[in-house]
């Protein structure tokens, strides 16, 4: 097994631009996030993400919520796919340049 493979398993991927699929996942958990933060976001645009392979997949998504404000959220996607999504955490008061990290 190469060092490259050892480094990737369980670790976070490099940051990648958000895709339509990542936006769809963010939109699906948005109501839970808004309930937990007691906020209604007019803008909710996924801009980048990192992934982590576990027994499923953790997605760390940076969201532009407008006015120069960003938030980071952690979404678990189970092995059964798009219908098995769980909001596992979030961080508010982030900036565009804040790096996505494990939470």
From Swiss-Prot:
PROSITE patterns registered for this protein in UniProt: CYSTATIN (PS00287)
Location of the motif Secondary area of contact: 52-56
Residues of the signal peptide: none
Annotated site residue numbers, Reactive site: 10
Tree of life domain: Eukaryota
A Gene Ontology molecular function term of the record: cysteine-type endopeptidase inhibitor activity
Function: This is an intracellular thiol proteinase inhibitor.
Locations listed in the record: Cytoplasm
Source species: Mus musculus (Mouse)
Family: Belongs to the cystatin family.
Protein name: Stefin-3
Chief place where the protein resides: cytoplasm
Keywords per UniProt: Cytoplasm, Protease inhibitor, Thiol protease inhibitor
